[in-house]
Amino acid sequence: MGALKPWHIAVLVVVLILLFGAKRLPDAARSLGRSLRIIKAETKSLHDDDRDLAEKANAQAGYQPLPPQVQQEPYPQQTPYQAPPQQQPVVDPVQRARDS
């Protein structure tokens, strides 16, 4: 289930041809390819811009090691939780007389 079988693809192609016509499909595929190429170029330029900004910031500030971390005092030790002692169930004297 969920696997795309060859006959699924064939049915999709037939439906697309019926909906859009054989003449418009190559144009649609071409424009889709152009759009994907543009998106790829834009994402690459965004990554390059981020990398350039990081390099400029490092060059301007110079390499500075991180300041040492301040150790925080540990939480004060708490006594472990102790469950209250279990009590014997209270037996009603009337019930005790019936059980005997």
From Swiss-Prot:
Assigned protein family: Belongs to the TatA/E family.
Species this chain originates from: Salinispora arenicola (strain CNS-205)
Taxonomic path: Bacteria, Bacillati, Actinomycetota, Actinomycetes, Micromonosporales
Transmembrane segments: 1-21
Biased composition (Basic and acidic residues): 44-55
Bilayer topology term: Single-pass membrane protein
PANTHER family: SEC-INDEPENDENT PROTEIN TRANSLOCASE PROTEIN TATA (PTHR42982:SF8)
Name used for this protein in its record: Sec-independent protein translocase protein TatA
Biased composition (Low complexity): 69-81
Chief location of this protein within or outside the cell: membrane
Compartments (UniProt record): Cell membrane
GO cellular component: TAT protein transport complex
